[in-house]
Amino acid sequence: MSVCIRCIKTDIMKIFCVGRNYAEHAKELGNAIPDEPVIFMKPKSALLQSHTPFYYPEFTNELHYECELVLRVSKNGKYIQENFASKYYDAVTVGIDFTARDIQNELKEKGLPWEKAKAWDNSAVIGKWVMLSGVKNKKDINFCLYKNKELVQQGSSTLMINSFDNVVSYISNYFSVNIGDLVFTGTPAGVGECVVGDELEGFMEDDSMFLMDIK
């Protein structure tokens, strides 16, 4: 796939995240495959740009990586029809939805929200942006994550339960989408633990999107 990489400067507004958007990932965590997108959010303070130091949070003993494709919203909208949704985002990258898995499991057992497990500072990593105008087929974007030079996760937009357009349309039924919003579109199977000293590198096709060390 040929891509055109360029820097995009924008103010981040909201960070939307989609859970259980790959069937195999839902199965590996023992979750049912949902009938509709599972949406949660992170605050702006969760954002961590590529090449910025990441420090292991002191409140968890089980930090997991979840590698995902991330969309950048380029147009304001509400109640967007799915067949027009592609007009509302213009760039894609690879990111990580860091999760304090031990805390998330405790919260899930109690039926409580996930914010303490997923929405803390620097829990939403993003790499460099790729303009979708340079992507030949956005329905077939391959991405992967390496931990310490070893492949640990790989996925493709073809394997998503809910497509980019479906996700953006669905979100807009409940929230306004605004220029600068981000959409983490879900993680494939292969999530796992990371520790201090690990190196994580995310790729889209053959291009490195981010490289980071856990300190």
Regions found by a protein language model. Name each.
Residues T187:
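Switch II (G3) loop of P-loop NTPases
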Residues M1-N178, L182, G190-K215:
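Catalytic-core "active-site belt" of small-molecule-metabolizing enzymes
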